[in-house]
């Protein structure tokens, strides 16, 4: 259901949505840095946000919009996070709402704001204002790719996807763009992620669906264990598909939620694979746990371990680092019953390392995509966590990312 064929259409794949991305001069690189996503028809709105206590000004502003369950637009910039900027930062985030509202002909409270970039610097509001106005003039059904490129920072490419499903006899479309490469760990959405759909769904149910989906998708990524001040995932549903409005948790709701999950899991894998300096995409599959929470905790412990991540960069089948991370995760486990496999090859069982085919394991470790399977043999629950390795390039990228 995650369609690469429609990925370029992204957030403008659903009916009634337009987007644009332009160069406002906020990024030192001179690349695209202001994005606008718009629906003339009012949309139900939902969002999840960072749990970092040092939340950025745009997070505060956008939470208020999402609380109304309605919006018309998303405006976002890259190159400056507008975080730790005090009262002026709050005023600037509100000004972004007002500027966009004036240009679009909607109310400021209908505009969600996102920012990403360097912390502690005030937005260059003259550039931001001109950028928003220019982006509104450039809005089109072909603007999703530019919008996606306008929100990235250290990403090597923009992330996008789209899909469709039949709900209530109508084709319902979904689109997504996201940024995320470093400063990613769970506890909300972990990235800037903007989702659109032409489904007709109650705003409260939309929020419930998004919150559940995020827990099983974007919150299952870990690149470097850091949680940003600016993280948010937003979904707008404008009802243009004409499906019978989803007002209860029935079969239509479940279909909607499942499609949203597939979309978000697909984008999560793209984000993890594009970790800063990453050379490996690693899936940590924990099964045999007593609960999803336990499985996730163990998976995150392994995914967050610098020793595990550097071992995979070095293509070293160091199962000791993996079982060590399992052991200190805080989830009760029996090391004599737990098993570990790399690429389907058993490397640890019955409390000791196994005898394995070195050539076969070398093939696993030199591949780009690697699956680490951990079976706790203590229940029926499972979870998949997506991560990447730590390379020399990761240190270089972040060492050179100056304020």
Where are the model-predicted features located?
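Generic structural marker for isolated residues within well-ordered, non-membrane alpha-helices
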Residues: 97
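A structural signal for small-residue-enriched, beta-sheet-centric alpha/beta enzyme cores
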Residues: 1-77, 81-92, 101-403
């Amino acid at each position: 259901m995650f369609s690469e064929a429609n990925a370029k259409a992204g957030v403008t794949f659903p009916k009634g949505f337009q987007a644009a991305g332009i160069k406002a001069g906020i990024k030192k690189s001179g690349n695209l840095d202001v994005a606008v996503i718009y629906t003339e028809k009012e949309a139900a709105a939902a969002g999840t946000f960072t749990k970092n206590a040092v939340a950025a000004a745009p997070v505060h502003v956008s939470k208020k919009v999402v609380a109304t369950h309605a919006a018309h637009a998303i405006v976002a910039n890259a190159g400056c996070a507008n975080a730790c900027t005090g009262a002026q930062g709050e005023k600037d985030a509100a000004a972004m709402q007002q500027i966009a509202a004036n240009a679009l002909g909607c109310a400021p409270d209908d505009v969600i704001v996102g920012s990403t970039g360097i912390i502690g610097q005030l937005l260059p509001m003259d550039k931001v204002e001109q950028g928003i106005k220019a982006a509104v003039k450039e809005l089109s059904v072909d603007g999703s790719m530019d919008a996606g490129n306008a929100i990235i920072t250290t990403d090597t490419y923009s992330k996008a996807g789209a899909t469709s499903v039949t709900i209530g006899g109508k084709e319902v479309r979904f689109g997504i763009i996201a940024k995320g490469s470093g400063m990613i760990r769970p506890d909300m959405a972990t990235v800037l992620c903007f989702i659109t759909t032409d489904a007709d769904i109650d705003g409260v149910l939309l929020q419930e669906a998004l919150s559940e989906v995020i827990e099983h998708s974007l919150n299952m990524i870990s690149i470097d264990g850091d949680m940003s001040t600016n993280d948010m995932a937003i979904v707008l549903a404008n009802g243009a598909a004409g499906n019978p409005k989803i007002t209860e948790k029935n079969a239509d709701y479940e279909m909607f939620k499942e499609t949203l999950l597939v979309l978000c899991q697909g984008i999560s894998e793209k984000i993890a694979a594009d970790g800063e300096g990453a050379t490996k995409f690693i899936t940590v599959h924990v099964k045999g746990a007593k609960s999803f929470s336990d499985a996730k905790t163990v998976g995150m412990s392994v995914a967050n371990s610098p020793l595990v991540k550097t071992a995979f960069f070095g293509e070293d089948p160091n199962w000791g680092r993996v079982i060590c991370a399992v052991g200190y995760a805080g989830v009760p486990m029996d090391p004599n019953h737990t098993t570990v496999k790399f690429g389907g090859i058993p490397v640890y069982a019955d409390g000791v390392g196994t005898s394995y085919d070195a050539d076969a394991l070398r093939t696993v470790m030199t591949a780009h995509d690697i699956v680490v399977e951990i079976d706790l043999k203590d229940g029926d629950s499972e979870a998949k966590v997506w991560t990447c390795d730590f390379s020399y390039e990761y240190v270089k990228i972040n060492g050179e990312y100056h304020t």
